[in-house]
Amino acid sequence: MSRLSIFPDHGDGGDGALPLPKLVCNDPASIQAELADRCVGFEQWPAAHALPPDADQSTILTTYASEVARVQRDGGYQTVDAIRMTPDHPEREALRNKFLSEHTHAEDEVRFFVEGQGLFSLHIDKEVLVTLCERGDLISVPAGTRHWFDMGPTPSFCALRFFNNSEGWVATFTGDSIAERFPRLD
């Protein structure tokens, strides 16, 4: 079940302890409304197609061709790819670490979860919005939004990624260690 937890971005007593969340909700409409208030898109779509365990990027994109075409058309996205992570993926640790530090993008970060789950943490103003996305969730993080992503130590997900450029995923890391203080997908 998708979940949103909203925290202040700083501890209460200066001891580095995680502050208590201001909000925790599992209701998709509430998640959508809270994120929309901060200009983040969130939708739930049916992920109606089951993928074979050995599905490659071409198979995944073909299976979800109508959804891909709609998102590309509506958002003007030039490029789309599919990322699929499994608990035995040989690069899982390196890829997890790559996304765990706070960063921004010059373009929107748009992801549709076809399988599994991932944890997006968005650092907006004085809040951190920890958003658990699961199968059927589409999240659109606006360009310039400070955030990080956790796939967990034993990742199991497939997501379609949409880009406004031909280079794909390009990040600018902030150097802020804030991500170390917030919940991960463990």
UniProtKB/Swiss-Prot annotation:
<comment type="pathway">
    <text>Amino-acid biosynthesis; L-methionine biosynthesis via salvage pathway; L-methionine from S-methyl-5-thio-alpha-D-ribose 1-phosphate: step 5/6.</text>
</comment>
<comment type="similarity">
    <text>Belongs to the acireductone dioxygenase (ARD) family.</text>
</comment>
<keyword id="KW-0408">Iron</keyword>
<keyword id="KW-0028">Amino-acid biosynthesis</keyword>
<dbReference type="InterPro" id="IPR014710">
    <property type="entry name" value="RmlC-like_jellyroll"/>
</dbReference>
<dbReference type="GO" id="GO:0005506">
    <property type="term" value="F:iron ion binding"/>
</dbReference>
<keyword id="KW-0479">Metal-binding</keyword>
<dbReference type="GO" id="GO:0010308">
    <property type="term" value="F:acireductone dioxygenase (Ni2+-requiring) activity"/>
</dbReference>
<feature type="binding site">
    <location>
        <position position="105"/>
    </location>
    <ligand>
        <name>Fe(2+)</name>
    </ligand>
</feature>
<comment type="function">
    <text>Catalyzes 2 different reactions between oxygen and the acireductone 1,2-dihydroxy-3-keto-5-methylthiopentene (DHK-MTPene) depending upon the metal bound in the active site. Fe-containing acireductone dioxygenase (Fe-ARD) produces formate and 2-keto-4-methylthiobutyrate (KMTB), the alpha-ketoacid precursor of methionine in the methionine recycle pathway. Ni-containing acireductone dioxygenase (Ni-ARD) produces methylthiopropionate, carbon monoxide and formate, and does not lie on the methionine recycle pathway.</text>
</comment>
<feature type="binding site">
    <location>
        <position position="103"/>
    </location>
    <ligand>
        <name>Fe(2+)</name>
    </ligand>
</feature>
<dbReference type="GO" id="GO:0019284">
    <property type="term" value="P:L-methionine salvage from S-adenosylmethionine"/>
</dbReference>
<dbReference type="InterPro" id="IPR011051">
    <property type="entry name" value="RmlC_Cupin_sf"/>
</dbReference>
<feature type="site" description="May play a role in metal incorporation in vivo">
    <location>
        <position position="102"/>
    </location>
</feature>
<keyword id="KW-0223">Dioxygenase</keyword>
<feature type="binding site">
    <location>
        <position position="109"/>
    </location>
    <ligand>
        <name>Fe(2+)</name>
    </ligand>
</feature>
<feature type="binding site">
    <location>
        <position position="147"/>
    </location>
    <ligand>
        <name>Fe(2+)</name>
    </ligand>
</feature>
<feature type="site" description="Important to generate the dianion">
    <location>
        <position position="111"/>
    </location>
</feature>
<feature type="binding site">
    <location>
        <position position="103"/>
    </location>
    <ligand>
        <name>Ni(2+)</name>
    </ligand>
</feature>
<feature type="binding site">
    <location>
        <position position="147"/>
    </location>
    <ligand>
        <name>Ni(2+)</name>
    </ligand>
</feature>
<keyword id="KW-0533">Nickel</keyword>
<comment type="subunit">
    <text>Monomer.</text>
</comment>
<dbReference type="InterPro" id="IPR023956">
    <property type="entry name" value="ARD_bac"/>
</dbReference>
<dbReference type="Pfam" id="PF03079">
    <property type="entry name" value="ARD"/>
</dbReference>
<dbReference type="GO" id="GO:0010309">
    <property type="term" value="F:acireductone dioxygenase [iron(II)-requiring] activity"/>
</dbReference>
<dbReference type="GO" id="GO:0016151">
    <property type="term" value="F:nickel cation binding"/>
</dbReference>
<keyword id="KW-0560">Oxidoreductase</keyword>
<feature type="binding site">
    <location>
        <position position="105"/>
    </location>
    <ligand>
        <name>Ni(2+)</name>
    </ligand>
</feature>
<feature type="site" description="May play a role in transmitting local conformational changes">
    <location>
        <position position="108"/>
    </location>
</feature>
<protein>
    <recommendedName>
        <fullName>Acireductone dioxygenase</fullName>
        <ecNumber>1.13.11.54</ecNumber>
        <ecNumber>1.13.11.53</ecNumber>
    </recommendedName>
</protein>
<keyword id="KW-0486">Methionine biosynthesis</keyword>
<feature type="binding site">
    <location>
        <position position="109"/>
    </location>
    <ligand>
        <name>Ni(2+)</name>
    </ligand>
</feature>
<dbReference type="InterPro" id="IPR004313">
    <property type="entry name" value="ARD"/>
</dbReference>
<dbReference type="GO" id="GO:0019509">
    <property type="term" value="P:L-methionine salvage from methylthioadenosine"/>
</dbReference>
